[in-house]
Amino acid sequence: MIRRVWPVLLAAALSAACTHVPQKSALAEWSPSRNFDDRRPRLIVLHATEMDSAEGALRVLKSANSGGRVSAHYLIAEDGRIVQLVKDSQRAWHAGGGRWGGYNDLNSVSLGIELDNDGEEAFAPAQIESLLRLLADLCQRHAIPREAVIAHGDMAPTRKRDPSARFPWQRLAEAGFGLWYGDDLPEPPAGFDAALALRAFGYDTRDLPAAVRAFTRRFRGEEREALDDTDRRILFDLLNGGARP
């Protein structure tokens, strides 16, 4: 039977104790942004800056720029340096419009991490190692399920594609963050509804081709608008727990 993985994971986060939790990471420099509201984190959204430099991204994330004010809780530079801009308890303006699972306002329930990357290049090993350390810190301090790490493109599939098809999701899963599939993929049962399964996983399927693009970008490293047999097997495996680190 297909299990609704994400609602269960996020419900667990809701019930976790969160008293006297530090709202700044000891791993990061503090460089405050004024663009935030207050709220509590329950999942983590990964972004790519899609800019030429970390310094340029910092300026945008901290200023009232003409394109609309944006921010994130953390920025990780290509060399692995971590900068915190907004306290974890505060609502940074990073996600924009979108949906994931039962959530319609992702800014109110998530922490946003920007990765210094132009959206096309490979992610630097030092950057990924810093990301893994930061994820461990955030999940531990806020009792966020380690599986509750998603892409910006996952929650906004019609308008976003970051952190890109080159992001190493399997590497994260091997370290215990996010979800990945196993080596032996089971055959879905007769009548398996892939659209329903994508929605159960968390995707907004009102634009089904966009949801499929987001899924294949994350789990196959390419963008397609129709699922093939392997995609369907992967989706079925993920809904039943996927690979375990």
Protein language model regions, located:
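Bacterial N-terminal signal peptides
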Residues: 7-16
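Short, well-ordered secondary-structure micro-motifs within conserved domains or adaptor modules
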Residues: 44-47, 216
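Active-site-adjacent loop/helix surface patches within enzyme catalytic domains
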Residues: 20-39, 43, 50-147
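Bacterial N-terminal signal peptides that target proteins for export
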Residues: 1-7
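Basic/polar, cationic surfaces and motifs that engage anionic cell-wall
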Residues: 18-23, 119, 123-245
